[in-house]
């Protein structure tokens, strides 16, 4: 099986199997497949119909060829494309190629989301990846793509707790018809049982509206001090999406409180360093540590000056 290159340039192997795509169907005994020969032939046929191609036309052709390869002959006017965690070049290139694209961003309580996202790498002791993940989250707060394009943020909590209100509203914004299949977990019209790698898989990971992920208490990795720093830096986002009530005076107090804390190690950093039996000075001189500190301080400086982010 051909591996897929990730954003960090590492190769990911057997993604489909790891995400449960080899155990679909009512009896979990079916495998998602694509006829490579049919896909290639259809893509070549579509390409032969054009004297010249650009990235967007080819992008649409790939989807059309895929549909034919899985025997899906429904006429479709829209493409729902999961551009998961793209790097800056890929995202801006996509915007340039398709400026009329509508962007849907799934959002979640940021500190809870942060702890969930870094969990695996934290327990692996991979500080470089952990720090980069937090940098990515902080950098997304004023991503210019979402302010300049037709974009909407959908709270995971609303989708899980109020699907009968959230899904119809999203359908209206997207210009699609609400159907029962939108309330089901499926792939190629086959029942999908969820991602086996999810920590919630055995609890309610097979339920599309399971609430374990949004009910999990924060604190298994991030201490109260860690949470204070991050929640303060996420404050404008938290207010905008209703995770906290607006309280500007408290925010200003918290900003002042965390300023000296930014130059000290987070408690989760102490834990990783202890696990790796690293030297403190060496750890604090590492590129990952310095890059993380630079991002924290730049985010703080911006909030101190404007009390919000650009978008």
Put a short name on every predicted segment.
Residues 13, 41, 64, 68, ...:
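Charged/polar, solvent-exposed surface patches and flexible loops
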Residues 1-57, 305-311:
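PAPS-dependent sulfotransferase catalytic core
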Residues 16, 20-35, 42, 54, ...:
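Poly-acidic low-complexity segments
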Residues 2-32, 70-99, 271, 278, ...:
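Short, charged N-terminal helix-start/capping segments
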Residues 42-50, 55-183, 191-207:
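PAPS-dependent sulfotransferase catalytic domain
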Residues 176-311:
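PAPS-dependent sulfotransferases, especially Golgi type II membrane carbohydrate sulfotransferases
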Residues 8, 152-153, 215:
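Preference for short coil/turn "hinge" residues that link or interrupt alpha-helices
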